[in-house]
Swiss-Prot record:
Disulfide bonds: none annotated. SUPFAM superfamilies: NAD(P)-binding Rossmann-fold domains. Transmembrane segments: none annotated. It comes from the Eukaryota. InterPro entries: NAD(P)-bd_dom, NAD(P)-bd_dom_sf. Signal peptide: none annotated. GO terms for cellular component: chloroplast; chloroplast envelope; chloroplast thylakoid; chloroplast thylakoid membrane; endoplasmic reticulum; plastoglobule. Belongs to the NAD(P)-dependent epimerase/dehydratase family. Residues 1-51 form a transit peptide. This is Uncharacterized protein At2g34460, chloroplastic. Pfam families: NAD_binding_10.
Length: 280
């Protein structure tokens, strides 16, 4: 079951006068600023969140949740015309062509100087090119991080996967770990990208979900430190929610979090969930 669910995984403020990322590695979240509701919404829309992999099953949900919460969004896609059929018209949504494999310079131009945060929800689709996972999940993510640094982006959120470090966890014979790595060592590629992010200096949150489900959310989010979970599943809707909350909660800074959903888990605020995980 875990194998089939993980196979479907496609790897996909606070906008105030202050910055997410400062010299002491801290940022002031949008929710910490005392504003009237209308003022807060206007403040959010002064900057954009760039979403890479915006038409993927998880990326699309991230875009929709950002828009529903009043964010302005720049959706990075490989086929703009096709993407236009995936989203409803929204004055806060800008669809732009972006291919993470084309290098950081082009990506920096697309991200622009009006994107204050970037969420990466890219992921390869199984095909004949066994190097695709490395082109997208490793080098593509690295390109995106370098582009963010060029543009001074203040927050980077990566949607990754549990079991990326399965070998070190003693899970090398885990069926899901074996199966996903059949496709060009996908999890190994993701892990290398994570290592680069940690050394980049950018304020990051790496979200590692369990097996992804397209069903409506059930249960409550369980959040654990990196290299803890080796089974379990979670709705893509909840993954998108966690990715957005990573922008809003200062407790998410410089952390790798693993998430699944469990019916028996208590309901906890995202502030508490992120605070419960030790950072870098």
């Amino acid at each position: 079951m875990a194998t089939s669910l993980l196979l479907r995984h496609s790897s996909a403020v606070f906008f105030s006068q202050s910055s997410f990322f400062t010299k002491n590695k801290s940022f002031r979240s949008f929710t910490s600023i005392k504003m009237e509701k209308g003022e807060a919404e206007n403040a959010v829309k002064t900057k954009k969140v760039f979403v890479a992999g915006a038409t993927g099953q998880t990326g699309k949900r991230i875009v929709e949740q950002l828009l529903s919460r009043g964010f302005a969004v720049k959706a990075g896609v490989r086929d703009v015309e096709k993407a236009k059929t995936s989203f409803k018209d929204d004055p806060s949504l800008q669809i732009v062509r972006a291919d993470v494999t084309e290098g950081p310079d082009k990506l920096a131009e697309v991200i622009g100087d009006d994107s204050q945060a970037v969420i990466c929800a890219t992921g390869f689709r199984p095909g004949f090119d066994i190097f695709t996972p490395w082109k997208v999940d490793n080098f593509g993510t690295v390109n995106l991080v370098d582009a963010c640094r060029k543009q001074g982006v203040e927050k980077f959120v990566l949607v990754s996967s549990i079991l990326v470090n399965g070998a070190a966890m003693g899970q090398i014979l885990n069926p899901a770990y074996l199966f996903l790595n059949l496709f060009g060592l996908t999890l190994v590629a993701k892990l290398q990208a994570e290592k680069y992010i940690k050394k980049s200096g950018i304020n990051y949150t790496i979200v590692r979900p369990g097996g992804l489900k397209n069903d409506p959310p059930t249960g409550n989010v369980v959040m654990e430190p990196e290299d803890t979970l080796y089974e379990g599943s979670i709705s893509r809707d909840l993954v998108a929610e966690v990715a957005v909350e990573a922008l809003l909660q200062e407790e998410s800074s410089f952390k790798v979090v693993e998430i699944v959903a469990r019916a028996e888990a208590p309901k906890r605020s995202y502030k508490d969930l992120f605070a419960s995980v030790k950072g870098q």
